[in-house]
Amino acid sequence: MRDKIRLVSSAGTGYFYTTTKNKRTMPEKMEIKKFDPKIRQHVIFKEAKIK
């Protein structure tokens, strides 16, 4: 089953992406490097719950 998650910028800008992940094949928290347009840099985005 795929669950919706939110990827929040570690730069503290408040920018986030939403995506899905398969909890069965990837039980650990997701960390991925993506572009943050507020600071115009690639930074690490960490998984958080969708509120």
Swiss-Prot record:
Asked whether the keyword Ribosomal protein is assigned, the reply is: yes
State whether keyword Protein biosynthesis applies: no
Query: What domain of life does the native source organism fall in?
Result: Bacteria
Q: Where, if anywhere, are coiled coils annotated?
A: none
* Pfam families xrefs: Ribosomal_L33 (PF00471)
- Gene Ontology CC: cytosolic large ribosomal subunit
- Drop me one GO molecular function for this one: structural constituent of ribosome
Alphabetized, the UniProt keywords read: Ribonucleoprotein, Ribosomal protein
Q: Which Gene Ontology terms describe the biological processes this protein takes part in?
A: translation
Protein family per UniProt: Belongs to the bacterial ribosomal protein bL33 family.
Name-wise, this protein is Large ribosomal subunit protein bL33
Q: Which organism is it from?
A: Acinetobacter baumannii (strain ATCC 17978 / DSM 105126 / CIP 53.77 / LMG 1025 / NCDC KC755 / 5377)
Lineage of the organism? Bacteria, Pseudomonadati, Pseudomonadota, Gammaproteobacteria, Moraxellales
Q: Which gene encodes it?
A: rpmG
